[in-house]
């Protein structure tokens, strides 16, 4: 019997997954509800439609998103092939003519002899090998099915994330390691503020510019996840009883309690990334860098993932997903794209590439491929399946996710070049196995 896989959703992840499957001789039933049923964000019936920006971000190898794109080129990604063909001048970034970009992908996928297109809404998960790549605006009926399959508490409908910072960029002379009331091991880095420093920070925060909500996000309610700037506007002392509460966090250098304390919590197993506890925010990214840079210790902080609050649909991947993008409780069911907790166009496509390769291996009775964590594709899969289950939030690819180099290199550009070189070597070895 001929092997086939259902792919639900023809966005960036679904289109890439379908392409990787047909490249390996696997038949694909590709389901896309547009244009029969539109989402609030899409405008066309094309596959891999770019709904926000036309930029696929940095292209150079001193940036992690440039590395993941190069890895995808080595693995014959249709998304990157199309982006390269449809590129428009954008300095060091890869930006595209969005109509040419999605048109090229639509034509290649639709016209492939192994692809059958189904223009209909999927409301229940099919039997047999399937990849779910329905994106952040998954239809309510399918979301209910996913909830039933993964467990009600493991499906989320919005993203409320605090900024994540590279540990190497924190001024360790100004912060101290301590847990509140010294309970358990000292697990947090603490940024102490004097009253004057707090007041300066407060004024900057309440007057900072926030990002505009998109029309389709306006119904989102963030219970228990109030943006820090909204909390601050309720009164100058509100944060002192919330995320900046200094009680039980005396500075071991002085023995005194600071006026306010921001806690940073380790975000990855390697201890290279820290998140700002309780600082989910809707500030514009430039404002986040400026305002949070007023906090002692964070003056030169490298924010690898800015705080966001927006409509999203994603599963708790650390709980329910394998690094191969297979569901732990049903190994013929794969997830790909933003649904898995990867953030961004390129990252979504990369997860589709990995899921597509592994779904092909599954139906052809081959061993699944766990992409090496030294690679950008592997570092992302490793992060979303091993991050904290309790506080899991979507993540962009960044060098903070990569394992550290055996020899410490202080110069950032040189360090990034070495990480990129190691990543591409790792992917070349994977490509040889395929």
From Swiss-Prot:
Tree of life domain: Bacteria
SUPFAM superfamilies xrefs: FAD/NAD(P)-binding domain
Catalytic activity entry: uridine(54) in tRNA + (6R)-5,10-methylene-5,6,7,8-tetrahydrofolate + NADH + H(+) = 5-methyluridine(54) in tRNA + (6S)-5,6,7,8-tetrahydrofolate + NAD(+); uridine(54) in tRNA + (6R)-5,10-methylene-5,6,7,8-tetrahydrofolate + NADPH + H(+) = 5-methyluridine(54) in tRNA + (6S)-5,6,7,8-tetrahydrofolate + NADP(+)
Essential cofactor(s): FAD
E.C. number: 2.1.1.74
Keywords assigned by UniProt, alphabetized: Cytoplasm, FAD, Flavoprotein, Methyltransferase, NAD, NADP, Transferase, tRNA processing
GO biological process: tRNA methylation; tRNA wobble uridine modification
Coarse class of the protein's main subcellular location: cytoplasm
Keyword field contains Transcription regulation: no
Record GO cellular component, one term: cytosol
One term of GO molecular function: tRNA (uracil(54)-C5)-methyltransferase activity, 5,10-methylenetetrahydrofolate-dependent
Residue numbers binding FAD: 9-14
Family label: Belongs to the MnmG family. TrmFO subfamily.
Protein name per Swiss-Prot or TrEMBL: Methylenetetrahydrofolate--tRNA-(uracil-5-)-methyltransferase TrmFO
Organism (species): Listeria innocua serovar 6a (strain ATCC BAA-680 / CLIP 11262)
